[in-house]
Amino acid sequence: MEEELQHSHCVNCVSRRCMTRPEPGISCDLIGCPLVCGAVFHSCKADEHRLLCPFERVPCLNSDFGCPFTMARNKVAEHLEMCPASVVCCTMEWNRWPVSYADRKSYENLSRDVDEVAQLDMALALQDQRMLLESLKVATMMSKATDKVSKPREQISVKSSVPEIPHANGLVSVDEESYGALYQATVETTRSLAAALDILNTATRDIGMLNTSVPNDMDEQQNARESLEDQNLKDQDHLYEEEIGAVGGIDYNDTNQNAQSEQNGSSDLLCDLNTSSYDTSALCNGFPLENICTQVIDQNQNLHGDSKQSNLTNGDCVASSDGTSKPSSSLAVAAQLREIIPSSALPNGTVQHILMPDDEGEGELCWKKVDLGDVKNVDVLSFSHAPSFNFLSNSCWSKPKEDKAVDTSDLEVAEDPMGLQGIDLITAALLFCLGDSPGGRGISDSRMADIYHIDVGTQTFSLPSAILATSTMVGEIASASACDHANPQLSNPSPFQTLGLDLVLECVARYQPKQRSMFTFVCGQLFRRKEFSSHFKNVHGDIHAGLNGWMEQRCPLAYYGCTYSQRRFCPSIQGAKIIHDRHLRSFGVQPCVSTVLVEPARNCVLGLHNDHLSSLPFEVLQHIAGFLDGFSLCQLSCVSKLMRDVCGSLLQSRGMVILQWGKRKYPEGNSSWQIKEKVWRFSTAFCSVNEWKFADILSMADHLKKCSYNVVEKREEAIPLPCMCVTRELTKEGRSLRSVLKPVL
């Protein structure tokens, strides 16, 4: 409180027994707290005391989040535990794999009797599948909306700079809606890169002319002494450069050798250890050639102090001179190979097959057997990369290759070998997600062979176009336009019936990497703060952890299609059981109902008697409903309008309030998020289960006696053991089977 509103004496006075007489402008009388909290203070400090009085009624700390209660200040901490606006979101996660094509048939059998038999693991898996399909549908709609907003901007920028040119193949514009913008943007980018490349080539050509005009006096004497051998090596280098194309393949077009080449300014500078001279090897498109023969010849030139500047072209490698001479001896090339490959690593010091120039032919290349035993070791440059034996093969001189889009139909495998014809869209979509996972079969299998990636086609079944037509991984399964283009044999059943996810829950920590095809599900349910601890313990700690065979035990022959299961555990009260509600997406506890109460309920359904519960006074119904948990209140509110009003009167004391936000746009163009409304609802928490007991049920062995899938296969024909497969003379002596099976030492 400001000092001018208080007296000069009262500002610093804190004594309960102050004896100062009240004087105008100096002091005032002592008073006690009107709420009888025990505080005594000067009357001018009454407003200041209200800010600290523990009995002063204040709104809840969560009043901005929707809590309507006001209480004494000393009760705020106690109220926060049951505050309807103190809401906690459960962030528990679990993972599931899509069902592989090998297990598809067995899961179809398990999903056959879902509505008749209540199974916890199946109910949770179907709930996860519905959440997955709904989330993918929302993601698809969001992506389509984004594309519609960004599409006009792209068309405006492209049409302003790129003229419309008719296609050379005589076709009309290729699907302007889907491919026009992408095609025109590609043309625009290509033109921009071409203009930038012309500027770069012009600048680098001028720099190259200045560099080549400077004489190199240090290399003139040595070049004169060994001019004959250098000329032979240069001619050999030119011969190789004329044969090699721009990407390392053979250039069969001899008519383009005199074409004008543009320098790109890239060079590969190699320093010789002996003569300290410099040499620039040929490059194509700014990258060094991967031809081992050219590298060996360049090293041999460095040994003799040759300084040569090769043409650096932006297309095919063009020879620097048109003269031809006899190829150099294969012995010099073998000497270079001797340094790269030690003779100890080869059998008898001999390279069996090496690509060598033919001395007797007309400059042609052939395979020769070269002996490296008598060749002297000379100093050459060592390679820093890992040793590879690719140069021993003829990969450099193979036929030119090209990238081509292929389909799995090129494998010439029988159509639909896995029997997937007629599956529904949901199963096919989840199979599509299973592509790169260890549990599925990918479209292609990527392998590595000596630094080369090889993709081997493995998938031999086709997927419906309704899945691949969308922009998400699985796609919008409920899209009518996509289903129209799908295979007519594919059906589209309700997602509540067919299970396409694995029943087994996988627990992977957040910090651990997950497979791309593994789906992660979050609980995401909202609870009051006092209900969260029991929910996490009972649902995630007890129920989820026991669904893999401990709480919900399935028949051992479930893989073959048996749908029988039994619940081994029940809450502490014998007869109560765990149930799952599909609409609430939550588990709950169904208490044991006496048969005395069940019979009148059946008669009420048949209309033989009136509903006695609805005839009770509203206050009595309100009192009875106060003993129910959130899960039961949600169920009761769906019975009738009267019960809905009864449950609605308990929302402030038993429910929770959730804020719904909405985006508000202003006339200026900006927008902001504001609270649209406050929604009251009950949580799905059930009463806490502190103890679990074994249910009073029959053993699984009793079911196996009458299981229709437990077919005993009787073998009447004797099958000899491996140790008994000997001649009859050894067994005619009457020896026992144990002596026959005794190992022979």
UniProtKB/Swiss-Prot annotation:
Domain F-box: 610-658
Spans annotated as Disordered: 211-231, 305-324
Compositionally biased residues, Polar residues: 305-314
Zinc fingers (TRAF-type) by residue: 48-109
Top-rank lineage group of the source organism: Eukaryota
Pathway of action: Protein modification; protein ubiquitination
GO MF annotations, alphabetized: ubiquitin protein ligase activity; zinc ion binding
Zinc recorded as keyword: yes
Function field: Substrate-recognition component of the SCF (SKP1-CUL1-F-box protein)-type E3 ubiquitin ligase complex. Required for muscle atrophy following denervation.
GO biological process: chromatin organization; chromosome condensation; chromosome segregation; gene expression; protein ubiquitination
Record's signal peptide: none
Pfam families in the cross-refs: F-box_4, zf-TRAF_2
Residue ranges, compositional bias (Basic and acidic residues): 222-231
Modification after translation, per record: Auto-ubiquitinated.
Subunit structure: Part of a SCF (SKP1-cullin-F-box) protein ligase complex. Interacts with SKP1, CUL1 and RBX1/ROC1.
GO cellular component: cytosol
Keywords attached to this entry: Metal-binding, Ubl conjugation, Ubl conjugation pathway, Zinc, Zinc-finger
Keyword set includes tRNA-binding: no
Name of the protein: F-box only protein 30
